Amino acid sequence: EMQRSLVGSEMCIRDRLFVVSFTILLVGCDNDLGHQSPDDEWTAETLVSQADVERSGVDAWFRSETISDQIFSRMWLKSWKEDCPLKRSELRYLKVLHRNADGNPQRGEMVVNAAIADKVIDVFRRLYQADYRIERMVLIDNYDADDESSMRANNSSSFNFRFMTGSTTKISKHGLGLAIDINTLYNPYVKQKDDESWHIEPATGEPYAFDRENKTNIPYKIDHNDLAYRLFTEAGFEWGGDWTSLKDYQHFEIDL
């Protein structure tokens, strides 16, 4: 009888220890994700708990800042080339939240022209509040400013200095920070070449390049019913999906 009592006591103690340990583990996990502030060092693709978003207020997580030395060092000789005529002061580093593929709040970053920074911040805030999904939003410098690599990763980005195809003087809209690409893998650039073959960027976006009107299984599809289309065009942007000589479904650009 005494032995059964001792065994029962040991089991009870083990159960209590398990509950305490499990509780500590849960709290620890929550601390790994939670208790973040928008004032912390900003690392894109980091998850943020809904509680922390609410604690600071949504607006605090959407900011436009000048290009710091740290950010510029990431851009140097990648998105920022030596022949770039823009001044650093003409660009802004955006900190935003977006809903990732799983619908969870995630830190994002983007460099845009200073003249449109507030406008873009407002669009991304409204997209976030509407639970709009953007899988990834990091500087294209994470991909050595290689468009194809960035697009294959379904990365959303803006500034990447370059001249327009065939020109050594005319800067592209991305080169001015006046164009934004959203969910790039599933909204590719599509142009028919002279030999009637197709040029598609990214190349892995070919399954999403044609007959888009009749396809209902394209993730992140941008069309005239899409919220990103509505918000960007309301803000004065032009959508590449409306072009006739080619289609650039990921692309929104604006004139100053």
Regions found by a protein language model. Name each.
Residues 30-32:
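Bacterial signal peptide processing site
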Residues 1-15:
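Single conserved hydrophobic/aromatic residue that forms the stacking wall/gate
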Residues 69, 135-137, 141-171, 231-240:
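Conserved short secondary-structure elements within globular domains
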Residues 38-43, 164-171, 176-256:
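Catalytic cores and adjacent binding grooves of peptidoglycan-active enzymes
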Residues 2, 123, 227-228:
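Residues within well-ordered alpha-helices
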Residues 26-28:
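C-terminal motif of bacterial Sec signal peptides marking the signal peptidase cleavage site
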Residues 41-98, 104-106, 172:
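Compositionally biased intrinsically disordered regions enriched in Thr/Gly
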Residues 86-151:
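Active-site acidic/histidine clusters and adjacent loop/turn architecture
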